[in-house]
Structures are given as structure tokens and as C-alpha cells.
Design a protein with these regions (language model features):
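N-terminal signal peptide c-region/cleavage motif recognized by signal peptidases
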Residues: 12-14
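Sec-dependent signal peptide recognition
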Residues: 1-7
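Amphipathic, charged alpha-helical segments and their helix-to-coil junctions
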Residues: 18-33, 40-44, 48-51, 79-119
């Protein structure tokens, strides 16, 4: 079921348009991926970037809800499944939120942060 959700999730919609400000904040570790499939704010950020993060999360929530309705699962399940894939893509220096709610940064030489439940 997880593989079907992932396939549907990542083929159903093109990658969300990321603005240069969002990409710069992500690269700086100011914003990052959360375990639940949403983008989060790890430290102080401008109102414009915070607004763009909220817009991205609204788009993700809509996608997760639509996919969940089609697959007969909860939007939270779809988000967690997406979170597994998004965390696997976190680059060195980028921030990410683990399931315990703590923000971390991926260090050089560190494996991609993938929770055990994703495997």
C-alpha cells in the first residue's frame, strides 16, 4: 500500500514551485521538511518566507486529502508516507524535524534522516 501511495503522490502533481527565498531558507537550515510531510520553520524567518511556507503546506494538504480520499486512507497516513520520501531527500546542512518534534540538521557524512517506520 505504501508503494502505491508514493507512486500516486509523486506522479499526481508536479513539484511545488519553490521561490528563491524558500530555497535559500531551506539551504540555510531556516526551514525544512517535517516527518509528517509538511514544510516547517526551524528558526526565525521573514514574514514573506513564513507565508510562502504556509502556501506550500496548503497545497500539500490539498494533495494529501485528495489522494487519501481516492485510496481510502487518512490524509495523515499520506502525509507520513510523503514525509518518508521528503526526509530521504534532505541535503547536508538542511534542517529537518523528527517525529519527536525536535529540529536537527543533516551533517556531512550523515545518512539521510529516514525513520525506521519508513523502511
Amino acid at each position: 500500500m505504501r508503494k502505491l501511495l508514493l507512486l500516486a503522490l509523486f506522479t499526481a502533481v508536479p513539484a511545488a514551485a519553490q521561490t528563491p527565498a524558500v530555497e535559500a531558507a531551506r539551504a540555510a537550515g531556516i526551514i525544512g521538511e517535517r516527518y509528517d510531510g509538511y514544510l516547517g520553520v526551524a528558526s526565525a524567518v521573514s514574514g514573506a518566507v513564513r507565508s510562502q511556507v504556509a502556501t506550500i503546506n496548503i497545497q500539500r494538504r490539498s494533495l494529501y486529502s485528495n489522494l487519501a480520499a481516492r485510496k481510502g486512507v487518512s490524509p495523515q497516513d499520506v502525509g507520513i508516507t510523503a514525509g518518508c520520501q521528503l526526509l530521504a531527500r534532505v541535503a547536508v546542512g538542511q534542517a529537518y524535524m523528527w517525529a519527536d518534534g525536535a529540529w536537527r540538521r543533516r551533517a556531512a557524512g550523515q545518512a539521510a534522516p529516514v525513520p525506521d517506520y519508513c523502511r
